[in-house]
Amino acid sequence: MNSEILKKAIAVYGEEPQIRQCMEECAELISAIVDYAESDEADIDNIIEEEADVLITCKQVEIISKDYVLESADNEEIKAEDKKTICNYTIKVLAEFIKTLNKYLRGKELPKYEICYQISNILLQFDFFNALLKLDGVSDIEKQLNHKIKYKLDRLKERLEKSE
């Protein structure tokens, strides 16, 4: 992910608005996951788009919190876990992150590792969730996600260039 574009967006739009944007994107992904969990005809494109938004904004929050570099765990396999269990846990991880960001915005003192720890949980949970999508017959998730992230970063770059 192009950190320079993300750093410029933070500088142009501000830290708090970008953190709020991350909270909003998490909420939108929760909504998309709920739709997926409750329906056999979920909008996979919407899930991928919302996940891309969360990944981009989490990277911005990671940049804002500065001190930690996070690595996503590589999980190739997923046990035969229930779809609702994985969806519910993904929602829980995203909701916990929203609560942490809200505390941060209210000026509550948080250990530096807390935000980074939760971002790493989100990234790890995305590995499980994407594995579930694969088991459900969705192919090329990583390719679709990378394409969507590139599109969104290019669009952000254009907006930033226009604002100069």
Briefly describe each language-model feature range.
Residues 1-164:
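Flexible "arm" and connector segments at domain edges
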